[in-house]
């Protein structure tokens, strides 16, 4: 949908409903993890992709009605990739009236020099970007760094670590940076990628494709993403259930001795988390936990979001 096209009442209604859902998801994540506090200066990392555009739009929207005051500054890292449209983001951000900074660093040249042809560039590229963004956050006096990773990214990372790294480790909604100086937040942690895609299409954001890493075929992350997408089509509700599982961890029923003192279990020990179910069949719900049909979800949105229409 182009910005200059007149949209129908139904399209506007659907867009309003979608924006309210994303706004609710972001608001809940912010509240659950205390992502944003009074007086925060949030550095919004804007890549030019659908996720970061959506994050900026929803944070700007929340800024107008939030019970606390916080400011936003958008930051884009121009990595000097051939053909990168340097004018797109400045024009877009100036039109919005958003404070911004474009950081120019030739990380593209470094990656191409260091990584052999045909090898994945993501690891080195992300390390270089991270250091530059931390430095920029310090220069701008930012108290939080906001990244545009969503629920699907978090699940993909969980499976990547399980399949290839031998760890049950996802992507935290909030963390202290590895240099110990910055707090990183992921406001889209509860948002579905398909909602973000629909919103970005409807808003006609000026998307800038990543020619450095996002287009590389057969990446491990892409394989995982395709697997999860297939599961979502074949088994509705599975994605929601898996994400719910990440929020309901039972250490006593796993095998990590750092999380639970198995050696300390002796006769007379307190029963923990239901005790021994080894000889019983645990009751499994007929429907996936946390899932509901699209129609019911839309009806719930109407009840939850009885607010003034989002413009």
Swiss-Prot record:
Paste the cofactor note.
Answer: Binds 1 [4Fe-4S] cluster per subunit. The cluster is chelated by three Cys residues, the fourth Fe has a free coordination site that may bind a sulfur atom transferred from the persulfide of IscS.
MF terms in GO: 4 iron, 4 sulfur cluster binding; ATP binding; magnesium ion binding; sulfurtransferase activity; tRNA binding
What are the entry keywords? 4Fe-4S, ATP-binding, Cytoplasm, Iron, Iron-sulfur, Magnesium, Metal-binding, Nucleotide-binding, RNA-binding, Transferase, tRNA processing, tRNA-binding
A GO CC term assigned to this protein in UniProt: cytoplasm
Give the enzyme's EC designation.
Answer: 2.8.1.-
Catalytic activity from the UniProt record: cytidine(32) in tRNA + S-sulfanyl-L-cysteinyl-[cysteine desulfurase] + AH2 + ATP = 2-thiocytidine(32) in tRNA + L-cysteinyl-[cysteine desulfurase] + A + AMP + diphosphate + H(+)
Mention any Pfam family matching this sequence: ATP_bind_3
Q: Name one GO biological process term.
A: tRNA thio-modification
Instruction: Tell me which positions the record assigns to the signal sequence.
Output: none
Gene3D superfamilies in the record, alphabetically? HUPs
Principal localization? Answer: cytoplasm
| Cofactors, names only | Mg(2+); [4Fe-4S] cluster
- Partners and quaternary state? Homodimer.
Functional note: Catalyzes the ATP-dependent 2-thiolation of cytidine in position 32 of tRNA, to form 2-thiocytidine (s(2)C32). The sulfur atoms are provided by the cysteine/cysteine desulfurase (IscS) system.
Q: Which HAMAP family match?
A: TtcA
- For this entry, the protein name equals tRNA-cytidine(32) 2-sulfurtransferase
Q: Which gene encodes it?
A: ttcA
